[in-house]
Amino acid sequence: MRFETRYTYDFVKRFLPDDCRRILEVGCGTGELAACLSRDGHEVVAIDIDPESVAAAQRVGVDSRVAKWPDFDDGRFHAVLFTRSLHHIHPLDRAVRHAADTLRESGRIIVEDFAHESADEKTLRWFVSTVRLLEATGSLAADDEFLQKVLSKTETLKAWRQNHEHELHTAAEINAQLEKTSSPVIREDAACYYRYAANAVTRTKERNSILQAFAEQEQTLSAEGSIIALGRRFVILRAR
């Protein structure tokens, strides 16, 4: 299992309700997480708006479908997962409300996302220095478009914002909508900067170790208050 999938999988498994049978993943990508959950014995339905991603998920045995949230409806679920997808979905209020309406009793909405608006100069200096270190060791592909945009700019924060201004919801907006469900909300910060390097890592054997070290450094430094963690996680606990 790739490190980034394991990182999300461990979070999701920690918060799945007891006797969780039916799971919906919104924004499944190529289906790696959904496949892992299916192997655990859960009935997983996975949707994505990209036909190629859905086809890839189907090839690994996932019940994946081309569909757009919140227009999709396939009965009730014990858990609805938004795996780095909710910041893209419009309208946000309807997306959250439909997820809540889709839950069975004691079901849960589990969200993994990122606070792109939280990036500051100090945090991005750490991010750039870490990426440059990996690049210097030959661990990163030189042609990764996003990383080259950030590394080539003298104003890193400006470059970051230019790459995250395409109608993306902020973590604060997501949190506000989740609070409107009138259910308890669990919140966690998490590592996420490592994901920007994930597709560029070229040293296959060491890939998971490299990304794990990247993520652990983000977690440690953010816990100390030295940087701001990028990842945000939310869990809605629906009452019986």
Question: Model regions: which residues?
Answer:
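A conserved beta-strand element that flanks and buttresses the S-adenosyl-L-methionine
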Residues: 81
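C-terminal lobe and adjacent flexible extensions of AdoMet/dcAdoMet transferase-like proteins
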Residues: 181, 188-240
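A short glycine-rich, Lys/Arg-flanked "PGG" loop and its adjoining helix->strand segment in the class I
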Residues: 94-105
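Class I SAM-dependent methyltransferase SAM/SAH-binding core
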Residues: 30-71
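Conserved class I S-adenosyl-L-methionine
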Residues: 20-27, 110-143
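Conserved alpha-helix/loop element of class I SAM-dependent methyltransferases that forms part
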Residues: 2-20
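Substrate-binding/catalytic lobe of Class I Rossmann-like enzymes that use SAM or dcSAM, i.e.
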Residues: 141-202
